[in-house]
């Protein structure tokens, strides 16, 4: 690898010599006779054109000679001086400036040094003469020519920073810059990829890849060093010689590797990210919601243990046994699960006839007879005891829901809920439909048993009604927040539910034939009339009223589903802990992890950057308006917002552009960074402060 670097240096050193030789008055011809300079020039120009075509193609190159960068390194800058003020000073004293970058520390504070790039070599030399020892806010500036970036590199090494460019050797000769960029894009955002070529425009088997961040360059070394590309092992290391534009990190960049640390291995989190153990058990408010947030598995945790369906919403009926010892639901779960499984197996084997082909379901009747007696009565008592606790908790829940301003952000995550689970639901319900056609005869026997049990539930339900009266005021206070949830859930329907619901249509028709066999006679035998008006009137439903229920709307299902598991435990007497963390919600932890992680695999833990949709553009022409900025960046994608930063009614030469998605913002950075507008090369990057 050292030989490859030295060879690259030799090419860079020999190219100027070739130009000097070509500029000599006479050049020897093939037969040894001197040829006048004028006759040789067309041949040299043709060769250069062919060479440029082979090397660059249509790629944009901001510098006429990419091997030369006219930089000046300035130190002893007052710490309160901004890059714009420094640029104005250099422009006033020297002339046109291409690029200015203040070097910052990990906290975003100036280190008192900067890199200034010029378009012409004369400007670089003039800056070293004119600005050196120039007094700025009482401090004499120190200016040095730095065309190879050596002074800036030393300053960055002192700051413990790494470059973002890697050097790749032992490449196959047919690998071009596009293939190199395609491969290394797996490690991060590639700003530029280059293949070093010889004087004939052929690959030398070495190249460089520049990433957006240094950590991506380190990751590329970990991922690709020693890996085969076209049967040749790549040798990847940090490029110590290159310092391309963009290696000077602005304050919004995250902290880089500590000084002296050469690299890091893979963490235990997703994508090799390190895990913060402090956030693993940080569930919020509604039970087992996963680390520091509420993902799809979290919000469906109570629902998916009841459905008997596969996929993210599935998981069988095993969790019904956790509804409290006083409810005897574990026995119901065992009988129903076993019977449904046997019925599904028989249906797949092609058995016909409801009574003869599903003997397990027919045997459910006597079992439910035994369950529905004492078991149902104990269920009512358990409900009465648990609902006393739930009532007070829901009143506290109302206070919490008033603070849930971030619920409006749930829409983007809920849009991802559709495709995540409904396709799995459709296939599972399709199998349930075949089984439901054979359940009818067994359900007839269930009716008699359940009727006896429900008759004995009337008295406990009276006690439940007294508790539900207390829920009315709490539910009314939940109304405004859940109304915002309803608006967000409207966005869920067209996004992901369409395909799943289309598949569910014919399946539901098949389920209907089985449900019809339950009939009115069976329902009449269930003893529901014993619940009567007296019990229902005591439930305080009039307190909930039309206004609250209309605002709650279709959002009640998903909103309450997330808490079903914890509510089940609360009914057994442990519900008091469900909302003991209201202080954390009030301080903002609830909004960030709840709304920000809907539909994902957990929320954004503190310290993990959220992808931004806004970019920051610098070095704009001062006559550039927000309309011109918006029109220009519309080439990359739909622009939601564009603005030029102003001071005293005049442009500061920088602005922001907001896109509809982080992907479009990243594409705009790749496309527009380094582009020239009115002779000024703009600098485009993600606005981390947005």
From Swiss-Prot:
Compositional bias of kind Low complexity: 1-13
Positions carrying Phosphoserine: 29, 85, 164, 325, 337, 357, 392, 412, 428, 441, 488, 535, 548, 578, 593, 597, 661
Annotated positions of the Omega-N-methylarginine modification: 456
Transport is among the record's keywords: no
Keyword Ligase: no
Residue span of region Disordered: 1-63
MF GO annotations: calcium-dependent protein binding; mRNA binding; protein antigen binding; protein domain specific binding; RNA binding
Modified residues (N-acetylalanine): 2
Cellular compartment(s): Nucleus matrix
Cross-link (Glycyl lysine isopeptide (Lys-Gly) (interchain with G-Cter in SUMO1)): 658
Segments forming domain RRM: 70-148, 164-241, 613-689
SUPFAM superfamilies tied to this protein: RNA-binding domain, RBD
Keyword annotations from UniProtKB, A to Z: Acetylation, Isopeptide bond, Methylation, mRNA processing, mRNA splicing, Nucleus, Phosphoprotein, Repeat, Ribonucleoprotein, RNA-binding, Spliceosome, Ubl conjugation
PTM notes: Sumoylated.
Entry-annotated residues carrying Phosphothreonine: 625
GO biological process, one term: cellular response to carcinoembryonic antigen
Top-level taxon of origin: Eukaryota
UniProt region (27 X 6 AA repeats of [GEVSTPAN]-[ILMV]-[DE]-[RH]-[MLVI]-[GAV]), positions on chain: 360-568
Protein name listed in UniProt: Heterogeneous nuclear ribonucleoprotein M
Gene coding for it: Hnrnpm
């Amino acid at each position: 690898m050292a030989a490859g670097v030295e060879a690259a240096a030799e090419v860079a050193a020999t190219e100027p010599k070739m130009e000097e030789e070509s500029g000599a008055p006479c050049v020897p011809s093939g037969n040894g006779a001197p040829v006048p300079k004028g006759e040789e020039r067309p041949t040299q120009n043709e060769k250069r054109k062919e060479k440029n075509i082979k090397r660059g193609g249509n790629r944009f190159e901001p510098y006429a000679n990419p091997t030369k960068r006219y930089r000046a390194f300035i130190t002893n800058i007052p710490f309160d001086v901004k890059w714009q003020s420094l640029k104005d000073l250099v422009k006033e004293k020297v002339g046109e400036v291409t690029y200015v970058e203040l070097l910052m520390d990990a906290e975003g504070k100036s280190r008192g040094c900067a890199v200034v790039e010029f378009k012409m070599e004369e400007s670089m030399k003039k800056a070293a003469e004119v600005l050196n020892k120039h007094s700025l806010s009482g401090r004499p500036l120190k200016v040095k020519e730095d065309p190879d970036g050596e002074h800036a590199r030393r300053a960055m090494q002192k700051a413990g920073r790494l470059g973002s460019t890697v050097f790749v050797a032992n490449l196959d000769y047919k690998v071009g810059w596009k293939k190199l960029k395609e491969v290394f894009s797996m490690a991060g955002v590639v700003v530029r990829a280059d293949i070093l070529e010889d004087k004939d425009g052929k690959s030398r088997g070495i190249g460089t890849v520049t990433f957006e961040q240094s950590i991506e360059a380190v990751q590329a070394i970990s991922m690709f060093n020693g890996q085969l590309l076209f049967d040749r092992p790549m040798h990847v290391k940090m490029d110590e010689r290159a310092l391309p534009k963009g290696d000077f990190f602005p304050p919004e960049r995250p902290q880089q590797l500590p000084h002296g640390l050469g690299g890091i291995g893979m963490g235990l989190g997703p994508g090799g990210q390190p895990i913060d153990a402090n956030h693993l058990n940080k569930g919020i408010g509604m039970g087992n919601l996963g680390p520091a947030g509420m993902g799809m598995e979290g919000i469906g945790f109570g629902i998916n243990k009841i459905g008997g369906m596969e996929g993210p919403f599935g998981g069988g009926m095993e969790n019904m046994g956790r509804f409290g010892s006083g409810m005897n639901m574990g026995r119901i779960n065992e009988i129903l699960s076993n019977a449904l499984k046997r019925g599904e197996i028989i249906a797949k084997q092609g058995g016909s006839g409801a009574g003869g082909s599903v003997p397990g379901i027919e045997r459910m009747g006597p079992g439910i007879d035994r369950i529905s007696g004492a078991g149902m009565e104990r269920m009512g008592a358990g409900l009465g005891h648990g609902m006393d606790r739930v009532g007070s908790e829901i009143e506290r829940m109302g206070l919490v829901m008033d603070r849930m301003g971030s619920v409006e952000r749930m829409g983007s995550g809920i849009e991802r809920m559709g495709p995540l689970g409904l396709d799995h639901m459709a296939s599972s319900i399709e199998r349930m439909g075949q089984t439901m056609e054979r359940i009818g005869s067994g359900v007839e026997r269930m009716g008699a048993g359940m009727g006896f049990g429900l008759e004995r539930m009337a008295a406990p339900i009276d006690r439940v009604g007294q508790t539900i009266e207390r829920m009315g005021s709490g539910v009314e206070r939940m109304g405004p927040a859940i109304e915002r949830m309803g608006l967000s859930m409207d966005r869920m329907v067209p996004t992901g539910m369409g395909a799943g619901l289309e598949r569910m249509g014919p399946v539901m028709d098949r389920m209907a034939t089985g449900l019809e066999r339950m009939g009115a006679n069976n329902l009449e035998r269930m003893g529901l009339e014993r619940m009567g008006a007296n019990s229902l009137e005591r439930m305080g439903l009039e307190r909930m009223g039309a206004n609250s229920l209309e605002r709650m709307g279709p959002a009640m299902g998903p909103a309450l589903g997330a808490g079903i598991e914890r509510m089940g435990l609360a009914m057994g007497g442990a519900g008091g802990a469900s909302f003991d963390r209201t202080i954390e919600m009030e301080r903002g932890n609830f909004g960030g992890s709840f709304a920000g992680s809907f539909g994902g695999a957990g929320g954004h833990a503190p310290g993990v950057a959220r992808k931004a949709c806004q970019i920051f553009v610098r070095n704009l022409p001062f006559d550039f308006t927000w309309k011109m900025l918006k029109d220009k960046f519309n080439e990359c994608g739909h622009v939601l917002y564009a603005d030029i930063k102003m001071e005293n009614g005049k442009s500061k030469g920088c602005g922001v552009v907001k896109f509809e998605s982080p992907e479009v913002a990243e594409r705009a950075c790749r496309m527009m960074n380094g582009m020239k507008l009115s002779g000024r090369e703009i600098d485009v990057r993600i606005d981390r402060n947005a």
